[in-house]
């Protein structure tokens, strides 16, 4: 399979891709299910983003900072030993890693945080709030707020703060105020709810840098477009590496921002398989999991209609994953739509499988992936035996695993 690829993308290319339909809908998913007090802020944000993408000064500044501050473009790395591990007698796929773990702050989250911080400045907002699960979005938001002199408040579940103590310290070191959230399961869902409550109260002075392709319109579109640089670079780098589009793209999915950033520039390239990997926790059959697309039903959470984990009464269920960044009972509406129309595929792997994959990649490639990313690596065990020789697979290495060392050591019985 061959394909003509675009020239090196610029920031202005990121917003050229398709918009959702009226009222921010992807099919039946998406929308704006929020208090009336937030509607003007959402309209202001949508208008500011539309104007910014048309402003050469904005895109030039974003491009400059993506290069000099974030460290883009991130490499497309051929994982030779991992490829050899999955090789069969008749050959097998070749595995490439899109190294988002090499970004400043250690994950893909900085792409969106930087773009939204620039929008906050354009809108005259001096205070920024964010939610975080694994802490990477919180760190990225605290980082850009320090860079631009913005007040930063981060909401984080108390359980996630325990699991991600290193990132909590990093946020505070960067000048952010980190509020522990003890309600509910004290994880990402509850942190998001608290951030929205803050925004409702302080909407005139505050911009909410939502960290995933979830929430009310325009956030799923906005976050996707700031992360689409991942897929744009991947297209160009694949041409340079092997002269055509990849056959398979893979990424972990919680809310789904890293996956959507990789997938979106390829959505219309129907010969390219798009595979998202969710967290099966203790196993989907146990009920202790975060496999929203695999097991969810349509509902409304945090301002958008999407697939959700729900009980028989329609109440949102608790999610479970060893990975704080995937421990969420919802998913971005565009992922729900891509699954419904058959454009993307989704699987799920357990905590134990993710731990095994993390160790395997660490020992074969000298790269310690985040626990979130390890879920995508774990799916290679299922996928690779089904692929023909010469298949080109690109996996989004969405973050590094420094933040997870204590959790992994504890689970492996080698507590630090």
Swiss-Prot record:
EC number(s) given by UniProt: 4.2.1.20
Keywords: Amino-acid biosynthesis, Aromatic amino acid biosynthesis, Lyase, Pyridoxal phosphate, Tryptophan biosynthesis
An annotated GO cellular component: cytoplasm
Enzyme class: lyase
Cofactor: pyridoxal 5'-phosphate
Reaction(s) the record says it catalyses: (1S,2R)-1-C-(indol-3-yl)glycerol 3-phosphate + L-serine = D-glyceraldehyde 3-phosphate + L-tryptophan + H2O
Residues modified to N6-(pyridoxal phosphate)lysine: 109
Domain of life of the organism encoding this protein: Bacteria
Family: Belongs to the TrpB family.
Subunit and partners: Tetramer of two alpha and two beta chains.
HAMAP family in the cross-refs: Trp_synth_beta (MF_00133)
Name under which the protein is recorded: Tryptophan synthase beta chain
Gene name of the record: trpB
């Amino acid at each position: 399979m061959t394909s003509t690829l675009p020239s090196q993308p610029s920031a202005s290319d990121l917003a050229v891709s398709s918009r959702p339909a009226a009222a921010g809908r992807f099919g039946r998913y998406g929308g704006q299910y929020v208090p009336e007090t937030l509607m003007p802020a959402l309209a202001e944000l949508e208008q500011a983003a539309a104007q910014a993408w048309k402003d050469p000064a904005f895109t030039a500044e974003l491009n400059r900072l993506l290069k000099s501050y974030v460290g883009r473009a991130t490499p497309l790395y051929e994982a030779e030993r991992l490829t050899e591990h999955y090789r069969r007698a008749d050959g097998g796929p070749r595995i490439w890693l899109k190294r988002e773990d090499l970004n400043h702050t250690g994950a893909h989250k900085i792409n969106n945080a930087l773009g939204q911080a620039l929008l906050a400045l354009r809108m005259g907002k001096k205070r920024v709030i964010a939610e975080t699960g694994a802490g990477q979005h919180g760190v990225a938001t605290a980082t850009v707020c320090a860079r631009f002199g913005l007040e930063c408040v981060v909401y984080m579940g108390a359980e996630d703060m325990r699991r991600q103590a290193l990132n909590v310290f990093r946020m505070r070191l960067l000048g952010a105020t980190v509020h522990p959230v003890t309600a509910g399961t004290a994880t990402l869902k509850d942190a998001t709810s608290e951030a929205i409550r803050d925004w409702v109260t302080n909407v005139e002075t505050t911009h909410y840098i939502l960290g995933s392709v979830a929430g009310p319109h325009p956030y799923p579109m906005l976050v996707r477009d700031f992360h689409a640089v991942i897929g744009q670079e991947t297209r160009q780098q694949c041409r340079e590496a092997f002269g055509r589009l990849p056959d398979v793209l893979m990424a972990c999915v919680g809310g789904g921002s890293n996956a959507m950033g990789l997938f979106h520039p390829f959505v219309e390239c129907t010969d390219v398989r798009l595979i998202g990997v969710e967290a099966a926790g203790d196993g989907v059959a146990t009920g202790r999991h975060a496999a929203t697309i695999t097991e969810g039903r349509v509902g409304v959470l945090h301002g958008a209609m999407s697939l959700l984990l729900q009980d028989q009464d329609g109440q949102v269920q608790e999610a479970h994953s060893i990975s704080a960044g995937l421990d969420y009972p919802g998913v971005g509406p565009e992922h729900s739509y891509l699954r419904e129309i058959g454009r993307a595929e989704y699987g799920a792997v357990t905590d134990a499988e993710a731990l095994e994959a993390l160790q395997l990649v660490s020992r074969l490639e000298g790269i310690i992936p985040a626990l979130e990313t390890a879920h995508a690596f774990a799916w290679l065990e299922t996928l690779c035996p089904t692929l023909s020789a010469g298949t080109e697979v690109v996996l989004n290495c969405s973050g590094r695993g420094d933040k997870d060392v204590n959790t992994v050591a504890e689970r492996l019985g080698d507590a630090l």
